A protein has these predicted regions:
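Ligand/substrate-recognition segments at binding pockets and active sites
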Residues: 70, 182, 194, 211, ...
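Short, well-ordered beta-strand elements
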Residues: 22-24, 61-64, 74-75, 90-95, ...
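Solvent-exposed coil/turn segments that connect beta secondary-structure elements
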Residues: 19-20, 27-31, 68-70, 79-81, ...
Length: 373
């Protein structure tokens, strides 16, 4: 099942016009349609390939699937029938390396040629000083947030969520967990987007205000909650820093370090958590706040109505105004603790050309990648 099938629910018909053109009909105007069609979830697949697509995907891209060793690697080879420009690479292997120490060792030994989203930012200066490597620093679409269960007492009280927001020192988290890599955010929107509103002052670091808000909420003695952390270093390192900052205003957190499967089961699907830290890397995903059954369980009819109106609006100026209003609503409701936009750091062999500096979508595009002569 396509995880983003709701994005395409408005399609009523797809008609073949000629060998290279199709006509897509919608049940109503959709201002996000073209953007949605650029998602990886909108790729074309042959119906007869569906049964085995989980283990042997078939597509129309520049490379074809060759082999998958679960937990270790995926092997691709150049597609001789690719419709676009012929890629320079004949083959490519994607390795799975999640541990920061192992990542550093693999790159330093040149066992891998490119490591996108490098998980150990503290090692980047060492690579920058080594002529064998190049370091690219860009941006992702990843809003890194202190996700909050809006239905769990006392987190269902906006004063408590506001107290948490003012107890957090974003820059200390960026410096301590990400070694300075990351851009502070005050809402769920990418700072490089033209429609971004800087709302960081709405939740500035103010522990005394945090204590005052807790007292107003009847929690002058503080309270305890859970902080369940997925594997990425931004979460594990950031979690320790945030726990210390919350403790300073009287909020105690019980930290649990989870593997991704556990996090998906307990937090994302089970909603059995108080706080968690995660980067939402899907582009332009502020619409998730209009889904009351989403894992942070935010239910605001005004916001839901705004998103419905946005989806049916195609005028760019009107859409911009709506997106800015949406950012302000969730910032003022302190739905989550908005931390930073995740940086996109890549370490690569100095001879590799054509790599993406930024990560505008969840893809690693190899069509333009080549080796220098």
């Amino acid at each position: 099942t396509n995880a983003q099938k709701a994005l395409f629910s408005g399609i009523t018909d797809v008609a073949v016009v000629n060998d290279t053109t199709v006509k897509v009909s919608l049940d109503k105007p959709n201002g996000s349609f073209l953007f949605n069609m650029a998602w990886g979830d909108a790729v074309i697949v042959a119906p007869e390939s569906i049964e085995g697509i989980k283990n042997k995907p078939v597509g129309t891209g520049a490379f074809t699937f060759q082999n998958w060793v679960q937990g270790d690697r995926i092997e691709l080879s150049r597609n001789p029938d690719y419709w676009g420009n012929r890629p320079a690479l004949e083959k490519a292997t994607f390795k799975f390396i999640s541990d920061p120490t192992a990542a550093f060792a693999a790159v330093m030994a040149q066992d891998v040629d490119v490591f996108t989203g490098f998980p150990a930012p503290e090692n980047l200066p060492q690579f920058e000083a080594d002529p064998r490597f190049q370091v690219l620093e860009g941006s992702t679409e990843g809003e890194t947030i202190l996700s909050t269960n809006n239905k769990m007492p006392p987190l269902d009280n906006v004063k408590v969520r506001k107290a948490i927001a003012h107890a957090i020192d974003r820059q200390a988290i960026i410096d301590g967990a990400m070694f300075g890599y990351g851009t502070p955010i005050g809402t769920h929107f990418a700072p490089h987007n033209p429609d971004y509103v800087d709302l960081t002052s709405n939740s500035n670091y103010d522990p005394e205000l945090s204590k005052k808000l807790l007292a107003e909420a009847g929690l002058s003695g503080g309270f305890k909650t859970t902080l369940k952390l997925p594997p990425p270093s931004y979460a594990r390192r950031g979690g320790e820093i945030i726990a210390s900052q919350l403790r300073a205003v009287g909020i105690e957190t019980e930290i649990s370090n989870l593997e991704w499967a556990q996090w998906l089961e307990q937090v994302f699907r089970g909603k059995d958590y108080g706080l968690t830290i995660v980067s939402h890397t899907e582009p332009m995903d502020i619409g998730i706040y209009a889904r009351p059954d989403y894992y942070f369980q935010y239910d605001n009819p005004e916001f839901q109505s705004l998103m419905t109106e946005l989806n049916g609006t195609t005028d760019p100026a009107k859409r911009s105004s709506m997106l800015k209003k949406a950012q302000r609503i969730i910032s003022n409701d302190y739905v989550n603790g908005y931390l930073f936009e995740l940086a996109f750091t890549t370490v690569a062999n100095a001879k590799v050309r054509g790599l993406w500096k930024n990560a505008p979508t969840q893809a690693t595009d190899l069509t333009g990648v080549s080796w220098a002569d």
